[in-house]
Amino acid sequence: MKKSDFHYDLPEELIAQAPLAERAASRLLVVPPTPAAFSDRQVRDLPELLQPGDLLIFNDTRVIPARLFGQKASGGRVEILIERLLGGQQARAQIGASKSPKAGSVIALDAGGQAEVLGRDGEFYLLRFDIPAPLEHWLLDAGRLPLPPYIRREPGLDDRERYQTVFAREVGAVAAPTAGLHFDEALLARLRERGVEFGHVTLHVGAGTFQPVRVDALDKHVMHTEWLNVGAALVEQVRRTRARGGRVIAVGTTVVRSLESAWRKTDDAPHGELQPFAGETQIFILPGYRIRSVDAMVTNFHLPESTLLMMVSAFAGCDRIFAAYAHAIAQRYRFFSYGDAMLLWSREWGIGNGES
């Protein structure tokens, strides 16, 4: 399978550059299993599309203002994108500079203080910050929001709110779990009234999510790592949902990535079941992989040739996804982080219940 198998042409004007005034006003392309027809709805219609007893699972990670600027001792300008907070005033980061900084070099930060380069960690750098407050708190004032590169404008004050889900609480992401951006408090209240339950996982979206696949042969692609936590309470929620005949719906690809990383075969469940898990994942989901943990997902439209497009193709089938994307382009849907969404149903109904 090749990266080029996942190419499509997108008119640039369909790339959303800013969010709509109302979160839940985004359009929602409902994609049921073949041969049922697509339907054009809005995210605010979700209470009509879901059933009492269904479980929506959100990613509760919180985006940090992870972009910093500074200057090397030589005078060269530096851009820093923090990929992960490591504790003890240390972080792993990408650095953009005319020449790669060496271990031991010091970067004077525009926001005050400095960062020492401790060394390399693969494509990343390890940095130690000399600043007047704990790094996590200091970044709230000193850092800039790392909007995706296809949003061709500087972040504004509104982005501090709108590039964050209303349920974000666990600090650590450098990019938003964008499917969750469509949910506001009013929609959540209506879903509760409908009898839909909510659960949460945490996956800290890393800078690797912005990196393109650099090889055409997908078996040569090295997937980036991200930290996640699927707690015991969420596992129990999923079990209760299955027992009552409810459906499990992931809000975003990061939730699917989390749940599939926590899927384990056991003596009682030879086909696998969800287990509590906290740690790193490098899972790469592409067609040929069977997603067992969810029945449906709410997800935005993804970049051509991206690993996220490969994941949704594994879930619903390549032909179905590309037909849906063609429909979305023809109907002038808005694409990517601040764009519209899909409600995507699995092409293999019942797999989430552990069937082979």
Swiss-Prot record:
GO annotation (BP), single: tRNA wobble guanine modification
Protein's cellular compartments: Cytoplasm
Name assigned to this protein: S-adenosylmethionine:tRNA ribosyltransferase-isomerase
Top enzyme class: transferase
MF annotations from Gene Ontology: S-adenosylmethionine:tRNA ribosyltransferase-isomerase activity
Similarity comment: family membership: Belongs to the QueA family.
Organism name: Xanthomonas campestris pv. campestris (strain B100)
Reaction(s) catalysed (UniProt annotation): 7-aminomethyl-7-carbaguanosine(34) in tRNA + S-adenosyl-L-methionine = epoxyqueuosine(34) in tRNA + adenine + L-methionine + 2 H(+)
Keywords annotated in UniProt: Cytoplasm, Queuosine biosynthesis, S-adenosyl-L-methionine, Transferase
Main location: cytoplasm
GO annotations of cellular component type: cytoplasm
Highest taxon of source: Bacteria
Enzyme Commission identifier(s): 2.4.99.17
Subunit note: Monomer.
Keyword check for Flavoprotein: no
